[in-house]
Amino acid sequence: MKIACDIPVSEVMSFPVIKATKNMSIYDIANIMTENNIGAVVIVENNKPIGIVTERDIVKRVVSKNLKPKDVLAEEVMSKKIITIPQNASITEAAKIMATHGIKRLPVVKDGELVGIVTQSDIVRVSPELLEIVIEYASITPEEKEVISLDTDEFSEEYINGICENCGYQGRVRLYQGRYLCDECIEEFEEKEE
């Protein structure tokens, strides 16, 4: 019998994943979310995840700027620094990644291709005790633990538990150009610099 924390994400993930292409309008994406009662759509190219559009992305990047959803494409709104998890990783690993990066869902991949999606709710439903572990893990400072490696140097920066000085998000933030910001706000600033 498997201990709940050792369960692979492939056993709790949702599949098939509701996905879209980067050329779809935000209007169509929002309708897909509504029809399927979901909070995010994974954007794929050749079945490989290249981004994710969340409800928060739509509110921050379309609604709050008074843009017309039919005129805005997914590629303009999606979070491009998508964090994925291998299907054989444990739900504990998934929970730690979510806590570290302040995200609620992780696309699950096999050989780089999208095979499912795992959410905080999926994990807590199977292993409620992980909720406490995740909260505790999120509050540990980088000095007290190793920074999680995600097979890329891109995410090796040190995070702290705090408040984003741009949007007010509470969770994992990191120093960026003299301010503590969440990953989504950092991505927005980097896009503006390009």
Swiss-Prot record:
Q: Which InterPro entries match?
A: ACP_MB, CBS_dom, CBS_dom_sf, Diverse_CBS-Domain
User: What are the binding positions for Zn(2+) in this chain?
Assistant: 164, 167, 182, 185
Nucleotide-binding keyword on record: no
Query: Is-annotated flag, keyword NAD?
Result: no
Amino acids binding Fe cation: 164, 167, 182, 185
User: What are the protein's UniProt keywords?
Assistant: CBS domain, Iron, Metal-binding, Repeat, Zinc
Entry-linked PROSITE patterns: ACP_MB (PS51901), CBS (PS51371)
State the Pfam families in the record.
CBS
Molecular-function GO term, any one? metal ion binding
Supply the SUPFAM superfamilies for this chain. Answer: CBS-domain pair
Where on the tree of life does the source sit, at the highest rank? Archaea
- Start and end of every CBS domain? 13-72, 78-133
Domain ACP-type MB span(s) in chain numbering: 159-192
Q: What is this protein called?
A: Uncharacterized protein MJ0653
